[in-house]
Amino acid sequence: YISNDISLALTHILRASVDGIAIGKNTLLIDSPKLDVRNVNIQDSNPIKIVFWGADPNIDSHISKHSDIYFLTSFTHKADNVIPIIDVNFDLNKLFKNLNINSLLIEGGNYIHKYFTANALYDKFYWFKSTNNIHSGIKFSDEVIESLKNKYKPINKFLLKDNQLTTYTCM
């Protein structure tokens, strides 16, 4: 893990507090996160899992491997856990309401954060930073950082041992 035990515990509390957790395709393929709540004191939480898949047609093996995940795609597919978002006017809020998702935690990746920050779609943004140097992997793009600076304001900073959590809210 990049983050420490305190950051991981807070992440699982955040996961337990929402109805759904979403990631992008690359995060699924590279990190293969479980997207569950792993905290012995919070056992009844089971957020709905969503992957913004996009246009990549190589989805079949992932659909069967992750039958507990809804895949949002830009194409139709026969699987029950694939939801096509083809219409430009597709209403994500309506979809989330139909899935009983009133609160959604976006955990990554960079493309999703880029879209959501640029369009000021986050109510709150939690940024966990580690002092550990990471030489590979996906970093936030400059666009995400610029959107955070221009469209969000930091409301709290917490030092968590060798990690820092900064929370932002939309301006």
What are these regions (language model features)?
Residues 1-171:
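Enzymes that bind and transform nitrogen-containing heteroaromatic metabolites
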